[in-house]
Amino acid sequence: MKEYNKSEIIFVVEMNSKGGITSDMVSEFSKFYTDTIDKNEPNTLGWGFYESGDKIILIERYLNDVAAIQHAKNISEGEILEKQFARFTEHFTFIKIDVFGNASDELKDFVKPFGLPFYFHNSYAMFSRG
């Protein structure tokens, strides 16, 4: 019998690069930040930066709400990825963040203080193999 993860949460983050940030700088930083997440967040299932015309799309896949909240904690002030996230914000501005999956009220409440444009989309049907 197949076992699927029905709790996966996916963030699709639409961003612009900040003025003075070249395509090469985006590429180099994206590799650095992706490696940083891979090394520090075992319950982050996937992470990737993608070119989309003049925008950058970041797709973040989390095992569940707990993993998504842990990531948000990790990038917060005084936490393990605070300095790396500060560099992130030197490169990118957020346009919007679409969150796919059945996000808990806890996750929704946790991200509110970030003051970013979050849009939550519950699933009708889905599966994730991990």
Residue ranges and their predicted role:
Residues 1-56, 63-73, 90-130:
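Short S/T/G/P-rich N-terminal loop/turn motif that feeds into the first structured element of a domain
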Residues 59-60, 84:
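A short gly/proline-enriched turn/hairpin at secondary-structure junctions
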Residues 79-87:
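A short, acidic, amphipathic alpha-helical segment used as a generic capping/interface helix at domain edges
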